[in-house]
């Protein structure tokens, strides 16, 4: 039976979140490396250590991206989000993302929470009302969000510029600055009108935000310095309502036809999802331990485009709702923000690195990748290329190389030959020797050093760096097996061969322990034919025996034909075919 060894020391309680994905389209590999796979690896490691950890997420189901999709497809927003919620939940499960709760922002509970946050912020004096200019469509009889407006860019003259940014020159502007603006939906003319909205008075939090961020000594310095510089440059009020019909209603007279801005209600979804989890476990008030106990570490895994929001606006909201005598909310302990993933696409004999484009179908959609390959090899490759310090490139060719050489040739090869050799020549049982050979003791010492480094990097939320230590464990174990040469000693010195293979099984247990956060399905399958502790050498209490029966390879090679088909799909998308 596979038993994951838990470490005896328990330090903190953890609440881990991943950014809420918009429920308006499928997930792709860029999403995974940004906010979901690194969080899942981290959470799985914490669970193995025996830590108290809850991992929540959910779909972001409000805002313009949803309504645009609905109008384009001739559906209601509810139909769109219901479909994509189910699709995403299934895709996450297929990819072995182990949420404790996966919620959605269209639930009654979430609406109540959003309105409660608003009321508390208003009571604290952090909400104000102001007029602003916005585009209005006389034909449709409604105000149009920026993404509903197109026109000619006032900077470069591009004729299909969006209402907030020009895709041609990258310029940002107000929608009413466009030349000859028109509705993206009807093509009809639009005009500037005045509308009234509610605002979060972010400048009132500037001092507290600066002090809090300055105290985060474990944050990356570039991130800290950037946010502090932004605060010192002056924060602006942020609108929290929009002229839109789909979203959380605003509990304010005169605002019946408006809804909360999606940026305001989405992060409250973290709280709602935690409450759902607590309710489901039969302890409805337990969510407070994770949101109001200073002993909890709140960690938000996000993409870098969400950094400013999660380090200024969201913390300000948490600060502002805790001033009416209730227990204050904790603030984020860390906000690991990953960079972006581009694509390597073969076109006309050369390989190009291009940006993903969901509108052009230029992406590696996760559900399609899972139709081609099991989850573990995909997780393994993506873990090796997590964009922790800079943008990265997804390559099907590199995927094949990593899986075949590192996953199979290094880790899988070691596990397979140790267990198959044990079964073939020693009946599948290796009893504990009276003493381990000196070479085994040296390997154990090397493992302890690598295990310590792996654990330190994991707790620093750097799973890509920890991944390198996992591969180093595999290489060190293979060197020990090769040097022990049990194919020779089984004849010349059977007792030495048994002792060496016993040590090999101990190393195997450590490899399986450290591989579990990355390739969980394979390590679960290992329990079908390996009996022995799966834990660090550092914590190992040598068992009376290791046993193996029916060992078989855990992974399959990635063949050239499969890679060629996957690359062809990207090539066609790039060429618009």
UniProtKB/Swiss-Prot annotation:
One of its GO terms (cellular component) is cytosol. Is required not only for elongation of protein synthesis but also for the initiation of all mRNA translation through initiator tRNA(fMet) aminoacylation. It catalyses: tRNA(Met) + L-methionine + ATP = L-methionyl-tRNA(Met) + AMP + diphosphate. It is found in: Cytoplasm. Keywords: Aminoacyl-tRNA synthetase, ATP-binding, Cytoplasm, Ligase, Metal-binding, Nucleotide-binding, Protein biosynthesis, Zinc. A motif ('KMSKS' region) lies at residues 355-359. Monomer. PANTHER family: METHIONINE--TRNA LIGASE (PTHR45765), METHIONINE--TRNA LIGASE, CYTOPLASMIC (PTHR45765:SF1). InterPro entries: aa-tRNA-synth_I_CS, Anticodon_Met, Met-tRNA_ligase_1, Met-tRNA_synth, Methionyl/Leucyl_tRNA_Synth, MetRS_core, MetRS_Zn, Rossmann-like_a/b/a_fold. It is an enzyme of class 6 (ligase). Its cofactor is Zn(2+). This is Methionine--tRNA ligase. ATP binds at residue 358. Its EC number is 6.1.1.10. One of its GO terms (biological process) is methionyl-tRNA aminoacylation. GO terms for molecular function: ATP binding; metal ion binding; methionine-tRNA ligase activity. Zn(2+) binds at residues 153, 156, 166, 169. Belongs to the class-I aminoacyl-tRNA synthetase family. MetG type 1 subfamily.
